[in-house]
Structure formats: C-alpha cells, structure tokens
C-alpha cells in the first residue's frame, strides 16, 4: 500500500482541487479523502505539492528499432517518468517503420518491459511510401492505438481521403504532420530568420496551413476524425477553428516549444533549436496560446525527438537533424510560459496534459478517482529549476539547457509503483 498525504489533489476530469490524501493498492486508487490513516503503508508527504494524474504524451519518438544510438524504448520510458509522464504514444518513423504486424509486435514486446505505459501508432502508408495504405484492421488488432506518418507529410490527397475513410470504418483516426514539401525550403528554419540571417529559403507558414486546410476539409467531407500534430502558425489555429465551426471532427496539439519560444532561439541555441515545424514568430506563439485558451487546441504533446550529440553538432546547421528532446522539460515549460505567465490556470494546463490526450485515444488514464488507475505525478509547481544537460534520455538536444524554469517533478507513480523519485 502507498499513502500520499497532504497534497493538493487536482483532477481535471471531476474538477477536484483540494488538499487531501490518496491511498493506493494493487495498481488502483482505493481511496481519496481529507484524512486517511493506514497502518504499515508506505507514505509520501506531499505537503505543498500538487498531486495530479500521471501526464500523458501522445507524440514521442523512441527510435526503436533502428536508431537506438539516439534513444531506445527503455531510455525513452525513463525520460518520460522523469518528466512526470506515465503514458506515452510512440511515433512509427523507426527503421524499419512500424508498418506491419511483425514489426509492431516486436516493438510492443519491448514496450511491455517498461514500468510506464508505452503505446505506439503504426504508419498510415507502407514504409512511409505515401502511396499504399497499411492494413489498418490487422495493425489495430495487433495493438496499434492509431495511425501516423509523422515526420513525412502525406502529399496525395487521394491517400489522405482513403486513410480517413478506412480509419472511420474502424472507429479510429489518423494524425497528420502538415508541411507541404512543394511549398517549403530548408526545414527547421522559419522563413523569416532563414531569409534574414541564414540567407536560405526556409520552412514557410503556407506549407503548414495550406496542407492543413486541405486535410481538415477532407475530414469534413468524409466525416472522419483527423488529429493535427504540432501546429505552429497563427493561420493554422484559424484553419482548425474554421473546420471545427463547420462541424468537422478535427483535434489539434501544440508542442511546448511552440508556445514558449520563437525563431530567435536559433541564434543562441543553434541546431538544438532546429525542429519541424520550426519555431515561428511571436505572433504565432501568441496565437497557439490563444488556441489553447479557447479550446481550439486541446492537447499539449512534446514531439520528443532525441538525436545524438554528434549529429546535432555539425558545422553546417542546415545538415543537422531537426528535433529536440522534450519529455523532461514539458511540464516546466507549461508551468512557466502558461501558468506563471497568467495564460492558463494550473487545472487547464493539467487537462491538456492528462485528461484530454487520454480521452483522444480512450485510454484508461489522465484522471484521479477511486477505483481508477494509480498513475500519479507529484510535483512542486513553484520550485525554480535550472535545466542542465543531465537527462534520463540518451539525448541532451534541448534548447532549454541553462534556462531556469518553474516546476520540479518529485515522484512519478505508475500502476501503483514509484517509477521516478527526484
């Protein structure tokens, strides 16, 4: 038995927000009450700390199989636990891609060894070829939770429509990375800073929002659910809002880096601030925050994208891979740039990091209730934390190293077991 005493228990599903005790047994929460005494229980004193549902991240890259010099499922799970996450959804851009049942089963076998809940999508098209759909039905039956070709946009509108129709038939959805290659230059650099500082053609806004406009309208026509990944532009928020207004089933996520920083970070942090989609303008940063506030964007997801230090530290920054490690800074960025900044309440932040992402996939997660799962994060919301280069992840490609942020994870509990302790 595990007894958590005197914490501020916050549950976005029920709205519970009060100081009370939580008793855990056999992987479940068995009691939540103002005062619990339990002889012989292991006790955590959570005085002054928030007791929240375990965080849920629906967009991570754990690089297994094929790229385990960057990360693997084990180190990814350790990074997740250190960041307060108890459930994650891996993307399928591995080598080989997760496009068939055999590869999926091998990945899920590896994931099952971890102490947190590690789930995965499968690809929409075979080996990311953009032309032939995978066997959605067989992959779902084998344990895939959804479908995404994340990392590679789907150029064929015919394939997008077919994928949506198939997903709808099977009561699932597809998640899309929206950057039209035909409208883009060098990825990872927003068009403004690319032109003015790096003297190259960069990643344009229109490449994101034009492709997104196409896809949300196909979703509208097919009555299928589409999930937009890591949107970054002011116009993209408007596109999602427009589609939702028409009655289309469109959901969207934003990554913490896009509500925290702008393209200027490239000048101080170099390749660690290079990502797809790129960091944009202050007007875009403000717009995605407004999208979170209005409910147009319902999910915060990290796009945790670890890379080896040698890959990032190349002489020509345009040759460096895009992406940043994100699991261990996500909560702190939300607390710093949304809650402390007065943009969202703590409960609203938690909703977008727990209940909403869990609900999207119908996971039994993201809430605190008696008889519910004992997936719990305990953190100090007010503590200052200097981000250093020591991560549980294999990778340290974070542009936030050296910055002081709010919030410190104290304990992560998954299935009733302490999986991380600061």
From Swiss-Prot:
Name this protein carries in UniProt: Dihydroorotase
Entry EC number(s): 3.5.2.3
Binding site for Zn(2+) 1: 59, 61, 150, 303
Co-factor(s): Zn(2+)
Active-site residue numbers: 303
GO molecular function, one term: zinc ion binding
Top-level lineage group: Bacteria
Pfam hit, one: Amidohydro_1
Assigned protein family: Belongs to the metallo-dependent hydrolases superfamily. DHOase family. Class I DHOase subfamily.
Binding site for substrate: 61-63, 93, 276, 307
Cofactor note: Binds 2 Zn(2+) ions per subunit.
Keyword terms of this UniProt record: Hydrolase, Metal-binding, Pyrimidine biosynthesis, Zinc
Pathway field: Pyrimidine metabolism; UMP biosynthesis via de novo pathway; (S)-dihydroorotate from bicarbonate: step 3/3
The organism of origin for this protein: Streptococcus pneumoniae (strain ATCC BAA-255 / R6)
Residues the entry annotates as binding Zn(2+) 2: 150, 177, 230
Reaction it catalyzes: (S)-dihydroorotate + H2O = N-carbamoyl-L-aspartate + H(+)
Biological processes, Gene Ontology terms: 'de novo' UMP biosynthetic process; purine nucleobase catabolic process
Function description: Catalyzes the reversible cyclization of carbamoyl aspartate to dihydroorotate.
GO cellular component, one term: cytoplasm
């Amino acid at each position: 038995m595990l007894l958590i005493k005197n914490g501020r228990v916050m549950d976005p599903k029920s709205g519970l927000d009060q100081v009370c005790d939580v008793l855990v047994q056999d992987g479940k929460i068995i009691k939540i009450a103002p005062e619990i005494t339990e002889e012989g229980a292991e006790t955590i004193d959570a005085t002054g700390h928030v007791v929240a549902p375990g965080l849920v991240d629906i967009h991570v890259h754990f690089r297994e199989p094929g790229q385990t010099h960057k990360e693997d499922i084990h180190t990814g799970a350790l990074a997740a636990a250190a960041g307060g996450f108890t459930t994650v959804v891996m993307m399928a851009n591995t080598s080989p891609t997760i496009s068939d049942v055999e590869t999926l089963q091998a990945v899920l076998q590896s994931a099952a060894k971890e102490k947190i809940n590690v789930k995965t999508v499968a690809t929409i098209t075979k080996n990311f070829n953009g032309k032939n759909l995978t066997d959605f039905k067989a992959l779902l039956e084998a344990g895939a939770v959804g479908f995404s070709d994340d990392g590679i946009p789907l150029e064929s509108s015919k394939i997008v429509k077919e994928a949506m129709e198939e997903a709808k038939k099977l009561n699932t959805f597809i998640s899309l990375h929206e950057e039209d290659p035909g409208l883009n230059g060098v990825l990872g650099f927003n068009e403004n800073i690319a032109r003015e500082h790096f003297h190259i053609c960069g990643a344009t806004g229109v490449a994101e929002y034009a492709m997104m406009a196409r896809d949300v309208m196909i979703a509208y026509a097919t009555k299928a659910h589409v999930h937009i990944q890591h949107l970054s532009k002011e116009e993209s928020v408007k596109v999602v809002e427009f589609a939702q207004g028409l009655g289309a089933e469109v959901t969207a996520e934003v990554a913490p880096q896009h509500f925290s920083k702008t393209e200027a970070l490239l000048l101080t942090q170099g390749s660690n601030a290079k990502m797809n989609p790129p960091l944009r303008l202050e007007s875009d940063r403000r717009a995605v925050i407004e999208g979170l506030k209005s409910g147009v964007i319902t999910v915060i997801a990290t796009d945790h994208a670890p890379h080896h230090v040698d890959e990032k530290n190349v002489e020509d920054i345009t040759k460096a891979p895009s992406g940043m490690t994100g699991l261990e800074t996500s909560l702190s960025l939300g607390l710093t740039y949304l809650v402390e900044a007065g943009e969202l309440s703590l409960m609203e932040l938690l909703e977008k990091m727990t209940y909403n992402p869990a609900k999207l996939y119908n996971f039994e997660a993201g809430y605190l209730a008696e008889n519910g799962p004992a997936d719990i994060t305990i953190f100090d919301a007010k503590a200052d934390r200097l981000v250093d280069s020591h991560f549980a992840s294999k990778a340290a490609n974070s542009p936030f190293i050296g910055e002081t942020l709010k919030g410190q994870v104290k304990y992560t509990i998954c299935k009733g077991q302490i999986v991380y302790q600061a």
